[in-house]
Structure formats: C-alpha cells, structure tokens
Amino acid sequence: MNGTEGPMFYVPMSNATGVVKSPYDYPQYYLVAPWAYGCLAAYMFFLIITGFPINFLTLYVTIEHKKLRTPLNYILLNLAISDLFMVFGGFTTTMYTSLHGYFVFGRIGCNLEGFFATLGGEMGLWSLVVLAFERWMVVCKPVSNFRFGENHAIMGVVFTWFMACTCAVPPLVGWSRYIPEGMQCSCGVDYYTRAPGYNNESFVIYMFLVHFIIPLIVIFFCYGRLVCTVKDAAAQQQESETTQRAEREVTRMVVIMVIGFLICWIPYASVAWYIFTHQGSEFGPVFMTVPAFFAKSAAVYNPCIYICMNKQFRHCMITTLCCGKNPFEEEEGASTTASKTEASSVSSSSVSPA
C-alpha cells in the first residue's frame, strides 16, 4: 500500500521510513512543505473575506427589500445560507488547522467540520438542482395550469435540506466516516480505505449516483429544455430584436450556470471516484486537496452567478450599499427595458438566475 492507514485516518504516504504520524496530533510537513500549508490558509482566508460578505449581503438585502421576498427567490436565500454553512463550518476551521499543519481539533472536531462542510456543499448542490427544476416548471410549463407559489418554494427548500442530510449524516452514524483528507487539514468522506465495519464502498457508490449523477442529469435536462423553449419563442417573433436579445441573454445565463456547476463538482467527483477505484495506488496529498477546494470555492462564485447577475438583486444590493441610491440606475433601467420581450410569455427575467 502506498499510504498509511491508522485509527480513523489515512495519510497518502508510505510509512516505510517511519515518518508518518497521526494528523490529529502532529504537523504533516513531511507531506508537503510548510509554505504549501501557508498558501492553503491564505486561500481559505480569501474565501472567507469574499464569501461571507456577499452571502450575508444577499440575506440582508432580501430582508430590507420586500419585492425580493418572492417564492422564486426562496431557493436563492437557501443557497446563500448553505454557503454561510461552508464559510463558518469549513473555511474558518481549515484556515486555522492549515496554520498549524495538521487537524488540531481531534476526532470530534473532524466529525463536526466534515459534517458542516458536507452539509453546506450538498445544500448548495441540491439548491442548484431545485433552482433548475423550478425554472423549468415556470417557463416550460410541463404541467398545464401550474402556478408556482409559496408552498412549492418551501417544499423545494425542505427538499434540499433533506437531501443534504442524507449525505452528511450517515458518516456520523457508521455508514462510512469522516477522516482528514488531502493535506490532512480538512475532513471529508472516506474514499481512501475499505475500513471494516464502515461500508465505505456502498456509501461512495450511493454518493456518486444519487448526489452527483442524478443532479447532473436533472440540471442538463431542465436547462436544455429551457433553452429550447426560449429559442422556440424567439423563432415565432423573428422580427423582434428585443426577443432575439432576450434569447441570447437567457442562453448566456444558462451556459454560465452549467459551466459553474461543472467546474465546482466534476473535478471533485472525478478524483474521488478515481481514488475509490484505485485504493492502494500512489497519489500525493495535493491530488485530493485541489479538487476539494474547487468545490469549496462555489461559496464565492455561486452568488456571483445566481444573484449578482440578476438585475433586481443587483439593483437592491447597490441601493443598500449606496445609502438608498443607485448611481447606475439609468443604465440598469435601460438594460432591463431592452431585455424584455414584446409579445412572448417567456422573458429573460423568468429564467435568469433569480
């Protein structure tokens, strides 16, 4: 084996020389140089100082502006809450442990950090799935006479919490486990070992199918149908420049949303699956660390894609930050007017990130 398995940990380095020590008790500078841990701590600090303000501002602005408290925006508030879970439950812990070079909070701390980081990440993932599904229902109208209301929005939010818990809770109760991963400064699900009694194999397969493949299929289907619906509406009004402009705007938004999802989850899922199917093979600590923080960075760029790109949210944020005035109001108003369709029931505002 090209790694060292101990009680409740797995270090991706052979202990032939006897240098490997528990990541709960000793600095892991034999894995990578101390400066790499400093870089990791700096990256976590960057995610904290950018992720917290934008997600907190999203919640604050929604409370301040009644027009934002619509059912279609509930899922965006849930997305902001999930990102704050990651900021406080994952980023702050990882920054502190990185400064020490090992997971200083011990086994209980590893369980807590792994749980909150996984819960926040999964809430964000399923929020994107529900967001895509809601837009598909509203725009494509697969169910005739369907009217999206507050009860539907609440059901969507509850669903994201339920699905997140079905991923984050099992490792706490014996189906798989949380252990330090990568550079041993953050904790995640055990993809690395076949530890007796934890059924890691079945849990990893469950996670890959239910919490990656299914969300991927739903998002591609919903946004694919949405783009087709908008294109059909635009084709019926070829003489309308505003309709064509709205179609291009919607298509651009959908492409950005899908690319953001893929950047977030493809690297992590691919590397985790590779490690799971090649247990015992040689791989460095950075191999798992980098994809994990691709997923963590979603707490910063998800709000930029799904909230700041939305004209209504953006306008309210600017007026809140500028003491009730929007210095760009004329530009925002002109852009909003130009993006409306003339006679189509499908508009860019109904399929935009918010």
From Swiss-Prot:
Compositionally biased tracts (Low complexity): 334-354
Motif ('Ionic lock' involved in activated form stabilization): 134-136
Organism: Cyprinus carpio
The protein's name in its UniProt record: Rhodopsin
Extracellular side: 1-36, 97-110, 174-202, 275-286
Topological category with respect to the lipid bilayer: Multi-pass membrane protein
UniProtKB keywords: Cell projection, Chromophore, Disulfide bond, G-protein coupled receptor, Glycoprotein, Lipoprotein, Membrane, Palmitate, Phosphoprotein, Photoreceptor protein, Receptor, Retinal protein, Sensory transduction, Transducer, Transmembrane, Transmembrane helix, Vision
Gene Ontology BP terms: absorption of visible light; G protein-coupled opsin signaling pathway; visual perception
Marked site positions, Plays an important role in the conformation switch to the active conformation: 113
UniProt-recorded Gene Ontology molecular function terms: 11-cis retinal binding; G protein-coupled photoreceptor activity
Annotated disulfide bonds: 110-187
Residue positions bearing lipid (S-palmitoyl cysteine): 322-323
Family that this chain belongs to: Belongs to the G-protein coupled receptor 1 family. Opsin subfamily.
Compartments where located: Membrane; Cell projection, Cilium, Photoreceptor outer segment
Annotated region described as Disordered, given as residue ranges: 333-354
Function: Photoreceptor required for image-forming vision at low light intensity. While most salt water fish species use retinal as chromophore, most freshwater fish use 3-dehydroretinal, or a mixture of retinal and 3-dehydroretinal. Light-induced isomerization of 11-cis to all-trans retinal triggers a conformational change that activates signaling via G-proteins. Subsequent receptor phosphorylation mediates displacement of the bound G-protein alpha subunit by arrestin and terminates signaling.
Transmembrane segments: 37-61, 74-96, 111-133, 153-173, 203-224, 253-274, 287-308
InterPro entries, alphabetized: GPCR_opsins, GPCR_Rhodpsn, GPCR_Rhodpsn_7TM, Opsin, Retinal_BS, Rhodopsin, Rhodopsin_N
SUPFAM superfamilies: Family A G protein-coupled receptor-like (SSF81321)
Cytoplasmic domain ranges by topology: 62-73, 134-152, 225-252, 309-354
Superkingdom per UniProt: Eukaryota
Gene Ontology cellular component list: membrane; photoreceptor disc membrane; plasma membrane
N6-(retinylidene)lysine carried by residues: 296
Glycosylated residues, chain numbering: 2, 15
PTM characteristics: Phosphorylated on some or all of the serine and threonine residues present in the C-terminal region.
